[in-house]
């Protein structure tokens, strides 16, 4: 693994679960608006540089907070896919499990991945590790992710920023 992250121009941008469910209600994440600002800026830079972009969308099924056929499960408008940008629908935290993400990355000659999205400690982390296990060099853009506080072993919450 390289000592430093690859430049965006030598990478493929993978946006993970940038869905409306994380912007409101029971699934709303701490710092989500600032993270989405960073995701949008990163996406603009990638598009301007001609970097391949792949969107990931979690499908939890009808009626769930991840219902991709409902507004709550849709990708946030300001970072929504443009024509030609594929969307990989997943059912597990690791976006490589039972999807065609690996095939799509191979098709664009990807070796370096720049990852952003939600939630940092779940799907972003799982996808980064899954990609590494398949030989990719993942870089997570911390400012373009968000999480929630989690219960700690001592009964005190672990802050979202620590994720």
Predicted regions: what they are:
Residues 1-12, 41-44, 48-49, 66-163:
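Active-site-adjacent betaalpha module
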Residues 15, 52-58, 141:
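Short beta-strand segments at enzyme active-site cores
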Residues 18, 59, 120:
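A generic "binding-loop/recognition-motif" signal
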Residues 19-25:
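Short acidic, Gly/Ser-rich segments with clustered Asp/Glu that frequently serve as metal-coordination loops
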Residues 22, 62, 147:
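Flexible, glycine-rich phosphate/dinucleotide-binding loops
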Residues 25-29, 65-67:
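Short, glycine/acidic-enriched capping/hinge loops at junctions between secondary-structure elements
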Residues 27-55:
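A short alpha/beta connector and helix-capping loop motif
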Residues 56-64, 71-72:
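Glycine-rich, small/polar surface segments that engage phosphate groups of diverse ligands
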């Amino acid at each position: 693994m390289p000592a430093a992250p690859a430049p965006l121009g030598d990478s493929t941008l993978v946006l993970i679960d940038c869905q409306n469910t994380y912007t409101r209600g029971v699934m709303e994440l701490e710092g989500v608006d600032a993270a989405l600002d960073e995701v949008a800026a990163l996406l603009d830079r990638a598009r301007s540089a001609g970097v391949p972009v792949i969107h990931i969308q979690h499908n939890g099924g009808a009626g769930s907070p991840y219902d991709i056929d409902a507004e709550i499960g849709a990708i946030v408008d300001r970072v929504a896919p443009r024509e030609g940008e594929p969307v990989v629908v997943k059912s597990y935290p690791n976006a490589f499990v039972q999807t065609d993400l690996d095939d799509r990355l191979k098709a664009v000659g990807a070796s370096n991945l720049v990852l952003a999205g939600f939630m940092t400690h779940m799907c972003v982390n799982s996808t980064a590790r899954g990609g590494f296990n398949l030989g990719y060099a993942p870089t997570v853009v911390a400012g373009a992710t968000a999480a929630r506080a989690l219960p700690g072993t001592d009964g005190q919450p672990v802050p979202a920023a620590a994720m």
